[in-house]
Amino acid sequence: MRESRPVIAARGVLLALALTTMSLSPFAASQATAQIESSDATFNEAVQAVKDKNFRHAVKLFSIQAQNNQHDAQYNLALLLEAGKGAPQDFTRALTWAWAAQLGGIEAAEELAEDLAGYLPEKAIEGVRNEVQERLRARIDEGQSAAVTQFATYHLLMLEEPDFEAAYIWFSIGAALGLEGALEARDEARENVEDEKIVDLQREAGTIYESLEIIID
């Protein structure tokens, strides 16, 4: 039997819950930024549903939060879908949300995503990649600044082989927007790009940048 995973029980609060027949380790503290009051209330209600073993209700509530890009909820939803609690076991959906949570800074999601990818054929994984990519682009088109650096990171971590050129473009855009960590990540990506391609990539980054209407949080 595999070791239990840490799951996020509450924003800033540690609890021990049971998702499997074994005792789970305490939930990891949330890395999400400040949420609106109703969002916290929904999250806490979902956590209580897990404690009460009302997994179906927990999946419903975490799904609402996951769709609204709450990364702690995305991680919890991925755990439930992996376990088949509250919804039939679904490794494809679980990987979608695990990757979203990983891109959102939930460290525990990385190991979960690796395990889930190990259960799936490459064709299914490619489908998840496409879904995650489309979701990120939609968020960028909506003006969500966090999605810019997440999209850059996606090209480094989620593809079969890192795409340093795309990562350089999007980290360049993030740096121009003043997003935290983007400048350093841009320079690291540049080290893996051929010099003769830099001008074209910078031009492409500039064109994309001018087309975006990003809202800085």
Positions of PLM-derived features:
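Bacterial N-terminal signal peptides that target proteins for export
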Residues: 2-14
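N-terminal leader/linker segments that initiate helical-solenoid repeat arrays
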Residues: 26-61
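Short helix-capping/linker turns of helical repeat alpha-solenoids
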Residues: 37, 53-54, 67-71, 83-85, ...
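Terminal, low-structured helical/coil segments at or just beyond the last alpha-helical repeat
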Residues: 120-146, 181-217
